[in-house]
Structure formats: structure tokens, C-alpha cells
């Protein structure tokens, strides 16, 4: 080793070989085979909780094929990727003796997977996730630290990973038993679960519809874990740190969730302090949680940016374990490393050359030593209860509530974020155009007292959030996170997005008015669906009040609001979105908007329907429908069965492979016609040249201010009435029934005659492409078309979940996808155990 100014020293530990170059790392109280150098760790005294430790347990395995931090178990959803696993084969569980350099293998499986070792409090056994080579699922296992006594704790057609012991010897882990898929990818979700020490009595302790990760006990007995969420905001910016009691009660932000960016994961307490060590994985996170190491001091609150300090510049560290406040054990690439709080580093290579060539890496190093148990927190869950209660102290209290008057908030709209039974790509289509990724259910409303307080029951184990409503039922403030209660839990909050370090405000009444009475029961909204579907629920209202002026013949304001279908969406849905009529959260890295900025409180569409647009005036039932649709994220379909189907030029695994028409004969001819008649004015990137051509617009984060969006494929092609496509009407002369809006460069304005009659060969070529697309859409079907059939993958999951019969014949047996999904969501509800009969 070059011992000049290098910050990195190398410890060479090769299996079967030992070089007695020993110095004492007193900061960690362990001896390492290391080339001696002055300073660094040697200046520290023999302190810390691991005095006398001599061994480290770690896992060896390859890296999976997917770059997402969470996508390392299970398989991809699309049928065309059937059999493509998210893991690699070949793994071992090993122990390294830091004094001798010798390694011993506790378990090895050339075709299996081993991950997430955790040492028991007594230091004599190891908990880990193991996938035997002839299987496809990880389950919890234990093994004695001498390699004896391997025993399987859990089983089933699900994956159980990232386990940790609780002080009473129960186990918390994350599991795909939650039966849901990532809202923006094609992989399964895992959330927090708990079981007994023997693997029995498995129960969910999470209400998340997205991923939870890497739970770990804090010194006070709470769990620290990563929670990923996106309620009407960016799907790639909010995966930060939360705490909860080991029974799932009292979920609370620990660090993050307001400011966007960074995946915070693999966090663990630093002995002797209030701080934690964490991986800050850049952006949306890296494969196997790789990132920079950071120390977080939570005492300033969850939103204090300066409370986190990175100790490494490089962003390729994984699985840290704080041995003291100045020594961290971690994995880095193929090696183990030790670092101090200043980022000085000692490398410990442990893999043989043949293992490196085989693509193996080190993972999850843990000191093999006893450690003290955290305090065991008493369970607060009452499994026999169907509900819990929520108390809101003052709905006007918050950090962005300026202008909200006393008594202005009259009710809370209670919404539920609904999990997906399947998903196929990274975008939100066709659920929305750049907006929501999920469906949201209306549970109902509860009253707010004059002092801003509310007290109400919530159904247990459901992911809920609230919209504060005024006297007209319009949104004043919208929650962009979720909460919920465990069975029998009583939960409280101070206000709306209040500072987590603040106390409740002084009030006229020492006790909130709502807390002085029994909790309200959520009142369903009469005459309204609970999950909205644009063609079914909103288009009829648009037809009655808007289409007379906004159709393919008249198109006032160049806005078309007919229910005609484009390649992915109806023309009305697309037009309302891109013309800024919905005020949804979009896919933006932004939270805590000002009052009346989102949903029904800001949507121009609602202003128009309430009487602010010529003589348009919807009735109260219609207005209620539109308000609720807006406040549930303004989705296009009301079913997840629409995902991955009913689209021309749709996306699967971020590739435009669903019915892409670009190479079809009709499209090739139409491209030539569009080039011939349109490119001299519009160029080649301003108008779509096929039903699948995005003309450079993002499919998952479109810029609504981009002028090209008004000429998008979603509006210029009509697959219900191909001859009413704007791509045909705009250049066609008025005398031939067109709009005549396009003209030759040498023609005066208003004299548009690029195409003079419908027999023009170029007109016929474009019409043939639209007709072929219409014909194909009728063949494959869209969710709102008669005889619609969901994808086989959707059917397969519903069969796996026991909601459709295995003998179902999808080609002949009718499927009510709306009813089946209602049954799916209901199957995930908390069902109290039966009362014993005496």
C-alpha cells in the first residue's frame, strides 16, 4: 500500500490465505490484517459497543438485472418477459475472522439466493432470507453461527426479505404478501410484516400501497424504515425515512418526505447517540441500495436539510453498520470497508478472483457479536376491532395555510389510495396523462367543527388521506401523503402539513370541540360512485353541457370535448388535461401547495360548469360528480384492468411495444403523405407521422406548455370516427367538409386548401392509417368498449389471489373487471378474527 496521502488502506483477506500484517483498529475494537499506516483509525482509543468482536457475517451474491433499488426479488409482470427473474443465482453466507483472515461458509447454494443476514441479540444465531436453488421465492431462515441448525421459518408463494429481530424475539420483515405491484414499474411490492419467532402468526403492519424497506429497531423501541409514496406528486422523489411502533401504530416521518430527492435506506442507529447512519442513494435510488453514506441527527425535525451530513463523496456504498460514532462497517463494490466519520476508509477485499469473475459481490456485513435489546413496546393493536379513530386538532393550523379563514373548512373528504393488482410500465398511462398513477376511492365525508377540529372513525389498515372542503364542497387544502390506523388505534394530528416540531396552537377551547364527543362515522356521498371512471361518469356531463360547442365540426377555442377515442385517451379527457382544466398534482416534485391550488378548489372546469362560462350551468348532482372526480386525481379509467391494453402505441417496460403501428403498411404510406403535404410548414418533429409518434414529448412527464402538445397524436387522430381526425380536417378545404385551417405558404390566411378534396391520394393514405388504427383498437378493445377483456396477467393475478376461478375461459367467460377489483381491494381489508364461541 502506498502510505503517502491516500485516505484508503487495503486489507487483503483472500479465502484460504493469511498474511500476518496486523494492526489494531482501536476505534472499532477489532484487529485487521492491514498494511500499517500512521494516523487514521489508530489514533482512536478502544471504545464502542463491540469491544472484543472478531467476526463479521456477510452475504455473497451477484447483482440483479434491474437498476431500481427495490427490484431484487420476484419476476417481471409482462407475459413477454415471463421467466425473467429479478435475482441472480449463486450465493453464500459467510463469516470472516478479522484476526486470522480465515473465512468459513455457513451456507452455500450455487443456484439459490441468500440475503439480508441479521445477528440475534445473543450473537449465536443468524436470521436471513434464503431462496433455495430449485425455488423462486425468498423466505425467512435461521442458522446457528457455527453453521448448524438451518431452519425455515416462513413459506408460501410470496417473498419475505430484509428481516430484523424485535426485542421480544418476534421478527419484522418486508414481504410481497401484500399482493400488489409497483405503481410505476412491473415488479412486485413488499411492505412491513411481522411474525412470531418461529415464523407463525404472520400479519401486516403497514398500510402502504408502495414499498417499505429495511426496517430496524431504534434505541427507544420504534422501527425505523424507508417508506416510498407518491400521492399526486412525483413518483421518483419521495422515498425517505419513517418510524412506527413494532405493531404498526403511530407511523411518523423521521427524516424527509417534504423536500424531494434522494432515496434514504438501510438506516440504523449509531450506538451511544440519537443519530443514525443511512445510505443516501442518488435520485430515484440505485441498484442494491448503493449510495453515499450519511449521518442524520433527527433532533432538529424531519425537514431540516442541515441535519444530514454525508461522510462519503462516492455513491457506491451499501449496507452500513455503525460500530461506534466514528466507525462504520459497509459493503463497497466487491469489498467490505471500514470508515470513520471523516470518510477515511479501510478496504477489506474478501472475494477470490474466480468469484469476482463470476460477478459476485459482498453484501450486508454485520458484526457477529451479542448486543443489547431495545425496550419492548407494548402492543396497542386490538385485532378484533374493524376501525380506529383520528383526532384533528385544527385544520387551519399549518405551514402553508395563509388566507384560510375561521370556519372556512367545513368538512373533510376521506379518500383511499388503492393498490394495483398488476402493472406493466414506468408511466401512468392510460390512468392519466402525466397525472395520477393510482385510483383513489371516495370513502365519504366527516364534519369539521368551528374551531377547525374533527374526530372520526377510520377503517383499519387502509391507506387514506384527506381533502379539506369549504361550504360548497370545493377543496381548500389537499393532503399529498397518506396515513391510517391499525385496529383499535387512536391517532391524532395537529393540523394540515404543520411543522412536526410544533405544538398545537392556543385555542379558545382547551380541548378541541370534536374531541369532546364520540367520533363521527364517515358518511358516504349519496348518488356517487366510490371509484370514478371518466367515460362512464364524466363524459355524459361533458356531452350535456360542452360538446355542442366543442366538437370536431365547431371546436370553439380549438378545444374538442367529444368522447371519441384517440390512441390512448378520449379526446375530451386529453383536451381537459392539456388545456389546464383539472388542477391535478401532476407528476411534479412538489408538495404542500397553497390553499385552493389543487383539485376542485382550483379546477377551471368546475368554474365553467358552475356558471362561469356562457350559459353553462350543471346541476348539483353533476357538480358533485365532477368535484369528487377532480379530488380523486381525475383518472381516465376507473379500473386497473385498463393497464397495458386498449392502446395504439402504448408502453410496456418503458418501451413502446403495445400495438406500435410505425411499421404497418398503412402507416408507412401515411408518413410519406404527411411528409409530402405537411413538413414544408411544420417540419418533421411538429406533427405526428404515425398513431404512435410522440414527436419528442415525454410519455410520463409531458410539458403542458410545449406548443406541440396541442398537435399530439392523442388529439389529431380519431379512432372512433377516422374521417373526423384533425390530421385530415385541418388541411382539407372547407368546401370539401374540412376545417381549412392549413394553407400553402403562398396562400393568404383563411384560404386554406392544402388538400382540396377527399379523393386526394395523400388524404386517402392518412385516412387509411386512421381506419386501420380504429379497426385494430376495436379488435383489442379498450376498458370502456363492449366485450372488453383484460390482459392475461391481470386475470392470472386475480386467479392467484383467489378472486377468479382457475378454470375460467377468458375467451368466452364474461368478466366484470370493476366488480372483481372491488373484491380484490376488499380482500386486502382488515378482517377481525372470529370471536371464540363458548
Language model feature labels by segment:
Residues 1-18:
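N-terminal secretory signal peptides that target proteins for export/translocation
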Residues 5-9, 32, 38, 577-580:
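Intrinsically disordered, low-complexity serine/threonine-rich segments
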Residues 18-20, 38:
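Hydrophobic alpha-helical segments, especially transmembrane helices
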Residues 38-47, 51-53, 88, 98, ...:
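Aromatic- and Gly/Pro-enriched helix-to-coil junctions and flexible linker segments
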Residues 39-451, 457, 476-478, 482-484, ...:
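Sequence signature of WD/YWTD-type beta-propeller architectures
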Amino acid at each position: 500500500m502506498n502510505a503517502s496521502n491516500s485516505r484508503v488502506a487495503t486489507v487483503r483477506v483472500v479465502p484460504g490465505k493469511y498474511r500476518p500484517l496486523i494492526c489494531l483498529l482501536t476505534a472499532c475494537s477489532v484487529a485487521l490484517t492491514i498494511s500499517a499506516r500512521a494516523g487514521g483509525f489508530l489514533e482512536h482509543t478502544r471504545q464502542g459497543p463491540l469491544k472484543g468482536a472478531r467476526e463479521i457475517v456477510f452475504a455473497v451474491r451477484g447483482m440483479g438485472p434491474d437498476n431500481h433499488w427495490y427490484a431484487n426479488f420476484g419476476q417481471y409482470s409482462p407475459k413477454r418477459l415471463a421467466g425473467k427473474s429479478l435475482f441472480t443465482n449463486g450465493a453464500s453466507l459467510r463469516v470472516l475472522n478479522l484476526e486470522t483472515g480465515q473465512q468459513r461458509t455457513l451456507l452455500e447454494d450455487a443456484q439459490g439466493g441468500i440475503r439480508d443476514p441479521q445477528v440475534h441479540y445473543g450473537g449465536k444465531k443468524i436470521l436471513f432470507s434464503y431462496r433455495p436453488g430449485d425455488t423462486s421465492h425468498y423466505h425467512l431462515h435461521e442458522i446457528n453461527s457455527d453453521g448448524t441448525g438451518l431452519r425455515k421459518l416462513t413459506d408460501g408463494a410470496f417473498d419475505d426479505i430484509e428481516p430484523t429481530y424485535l426485542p421480544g424475539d418476534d421478527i419484522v420483515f418486508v414481504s410481497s404478501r401484500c399482493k400488489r405491484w409497483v405503481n410505476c414499474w412491473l415488479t412486485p411490492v413488499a411492505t412491513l410484516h411481522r411474525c412470531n419467532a418461529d415464523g407463525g402468526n404472520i400479519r401486516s403492519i403497514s398500510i402502504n400501497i408502495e414499498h417499505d424497506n429495511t426496517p430496524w429497531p431504534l434505541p427507544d423501541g420504534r422501527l425505523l424504515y424507508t417508506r416510498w409514496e407518491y400521492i399526486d406528486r412525483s413518483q421518483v422523489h419521495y422515498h425517505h425515512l419513517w418510524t412506527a411502533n413494532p405493531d404498526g401504530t403511530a407511523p411518523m416521518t423521521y427524516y424527509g418526505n417534504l423536500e424531494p430527492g434522494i432515496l434514504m435506506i438501510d438506516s440504523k442507529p449509531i450506538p451511544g447517540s440519537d443519530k443514525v447512519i443511512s445510505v443516501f442513494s442518488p435520485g430515484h435510488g440505485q441498484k442494491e441500495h448503493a449510495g453515499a453514506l450519511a449521518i442524520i441527527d433527527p433532533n432538529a425535525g424531519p425537514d431540516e436539510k442541515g441535519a444530514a451530513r454525508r461522510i462519503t463523496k462516492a455513491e457506491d456504498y451499501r449496507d452500513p453498520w455503525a460500530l461506534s460514532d466514528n466507525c462504520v462497517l459497509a459493503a463497497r463494490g466487491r469489498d467490505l470497508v471500514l470508515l470513520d466519520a471523516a470518510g477515511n476508509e479501510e478496504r477489506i477485499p474478501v472475494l477470490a478472483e474466480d468469484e469476482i469473475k463470476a460477478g459476485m459481490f459482498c453484501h450486508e456485513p454485520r458484526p457477529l457479536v451479542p448486543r443489547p435489546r431495545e425496550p419492548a413496546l407494548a402492543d396497542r393493536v386490538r385485532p378484533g376491532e374493524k376501525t380506529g379513530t383520528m383526532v384533528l386538532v385544527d385544520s387551519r393550523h399549518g405551514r402553508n395555510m395563509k388566507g384560510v379563514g375561521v370556519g372556512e373548512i367545513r368538512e373533510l373528504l376521506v379518500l383511499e389510495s388503492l393498490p394495483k393488482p398488476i402493472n406493466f410500465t414506468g408511466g401512468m398511462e392510460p390512468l392519466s396523462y402525466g397525472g395520477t398513477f393510482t385510483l383513489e376511492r371516495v370513502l365519504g365525508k366527516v364534519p369539521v367543527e368551528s374551531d377547525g377540529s374533527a374526530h372520526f372513525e377510520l377503517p383499519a389498515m387502509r391507506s387514506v388521506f384527506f381533502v379539506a372542503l369549504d361550504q360548497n364542497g370545493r377543496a381548500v387544502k389537499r393532503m399529498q401523503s397518506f396515513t391510517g390506523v391499525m385496529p383499535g388505534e387512536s391517532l391524532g394530528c395537529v393540523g394540515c402539513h404543520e411543522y412536526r416540531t410544533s405544538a398545537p396552537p392556543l385555542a379558545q377551547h382547551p380541548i378541541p370541540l370534536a374531541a369532546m364527543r364520540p367520533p363521527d362515522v364517515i358518511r358516504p356521498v349519496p348518488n356517487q360512485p366510490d371509484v370514478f371512471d371518466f367515460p362512464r361518469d364524466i363524459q355524459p356531463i361533458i356531452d350535456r353541457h360542452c360538446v355542442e360547442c366543442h366538437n370536431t365540426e365547431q371546436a370553439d377555442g380549438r378545444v374538442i370535448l367529444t368522447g371519441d377515442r384517440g390512441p390512448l385517451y378520449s379526446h375530451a379527457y386529453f383536451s381537459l388535461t392539456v388545456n389546464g382544466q383539472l388542477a391535478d398534482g401532476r407528476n411534479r416534485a412538489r408538495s404542500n401547495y397553497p390553499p385552493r391550488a389543487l383539485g376542485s378548489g382550483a379546477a377551471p372546469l368546475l368554474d365553467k360548469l358552475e356558471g362561469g362560462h356562457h350559459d353553462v350551468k350543471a346541476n348539483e348532482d353533476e357538480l358533485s360528480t365532477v368535484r369528487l372526480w377532480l379530488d380523486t386525481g381525475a383518472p381516465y379509467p376507473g379500473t386497473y384492468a385498463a393497464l397495458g391494453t386498449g392502446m395504439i402505441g402504448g408502453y410496456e417496460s418503458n418501451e413502446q411495444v403495445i400495438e406500435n403501428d410505425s411499421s404497418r403498411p398503412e402507416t408507412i404510406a401515411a408518413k410519406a403523405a404527411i411528409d409530402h403535404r405537411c413538413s414544408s410548414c411544420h417540419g418533421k418533429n411538429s406533427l405526428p407521422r404515425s398513431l404512435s409518434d410522440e414527436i419528442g414529448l415525454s410519455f410520463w412527464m409531458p410539458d403542458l406548455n410545449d406548443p406541440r402538445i396541442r398537435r399530439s397524436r392523442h388529439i389529431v387522430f380519431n379512432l372512433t370516427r377516422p374521417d373526423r381526425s384533425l390530421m385530415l380536417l385541418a388541411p382539407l378545404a372547407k368546401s370539401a367538409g374540412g376545417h381549412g385551417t392549413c394553407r400553402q405558404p403562398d396562400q393568404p390566411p383563411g384560404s386554406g386548401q392544402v388538400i382540396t378534396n377527399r379523393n386526394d391520394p395523400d388524404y386517402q393514405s392518412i385516412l387509411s392509417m386512421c381506419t386501420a388504427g380504429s379497426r385494430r383498437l376495436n379488435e383489442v378493445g379498450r376498458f370502456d368498449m363492449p366485450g372488453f377483456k383484460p390482459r392475461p396477467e391481470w386475470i392470472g393475478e386475480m386467479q392467484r389471489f383467489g378472486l377468479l376461478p382457475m378454470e375460467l375461459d377468458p375467451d368466452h367467460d364474461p368478466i366484470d373487471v370493476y366488480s372483481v377489483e372491488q373484491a380484490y381491494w376488499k380482500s386486502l381489508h382488515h378482517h377481525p378474527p372470529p370471536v371464540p364461541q363458548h
